[in-house]
Structure formats: structure tokens, C-alpha cells
Amino acid sequence: MHFNNFLSNKTRNHSFSKSKIDNLNSIPFSKDDYKILESPITFRETLLKLINNAKSRICINALYLQHDEAGIEILNAIAQAIKNNPNLYVRIYVDFHRAQRGLCGKGPQIGNNVWYQQFAKENNLSLNIFGVPVKKREIFGVLHLKGFVIDNTVLYSGASINNVYLQKFDRYRIDRYH
């Protein structure tokens, strides 16, 4: 059965026509304007290079910025970028609940939020890291966006910032969505 048979008449009447789609706001780009990064190592290296060369802004959305070697590497790069350019616009958005804790199953740990505060104090920085509470309890939903805007470059990813997703060592998590 064709999908349209499941739609109500009201829905069908409000569907997008080609002319409506053509009139939506957009940013045109060609195939030469984007690149697919095919490995987590390439992604991490590209992210670090962009951060190190940032001139105007660094905006990061991630489920979490983990207090591990990869997270430290990224946060150190951001701190250095701020020191090199004090007028750099930096905003990092992470899930509120994930920032309150460390890794599950690793025993007692300080939350990532405490690490962010300690890092900022030790480096004499004003870091804008925001915990976004999507729901009142983590079990009901989290901020799961993963996007990076550095100057005029946009990186989309399925990776949060930690050792496993950025393949800091020999381990890498391959998600089932491929």
C-alpha cells in the first residue's frame, strides 16, 4: 500500500508542493562545498584543526563533553583558541543530566560539570558551557544534538566528545545506523 493512502485528506491538502519547497529559505552549495569525513580519527583531527584556527566563533552541541583524554584534548584546544583570540565567541551546549555525572559503571566520580568549572578556574577562563535540560529526568530524554560550527564551517556528527567516539586510543564505537 502506498504511504499516501495513510494520510488524511487534511494532511494531503497541506503537503509541500515543489513551488513551496523552491521558495523556502536556503543556503545554496555545490558538491565541492562539503566533504565526508570517513573515520573518527579524521573527524577528531579536523575538529582540532578548526578549533586551533578559529577566528570568530566556536559553537558546539554535544550530548556530553566527557572528562577523559579526548574531552581534555578538545577543551585544551578551545582554551588555547580563547587565549589566542580573547574576542572569540565560544558556546558549548551539553545535556544537563549527562553533565551532572561521569561515566556509568565507573564508580564514584565528580560530574563533568565540576570538571568544566575546575578547568575554567585553573586556566583563568570564562567558559560558556551550558547544560540544557530537555526533560526533568534523563530517562525521559536528553539533548542528543551533535553539531559543531567553527567560523563558517559546519560539522555534523553522531559523535559526542569522548575517547570512544573520537577514537582517542584503539577503541571506537560504531553505531548501528550505517
Regions found by a protein language model. Give the residues of each.
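Non-Sec secretion/translocation targeting segments of pathogen effectors
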Residues: M1-F3
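HKD-type phospholipase D/PLD-like phosphodiesterase module
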Residues: F6-N53, Q66-H178
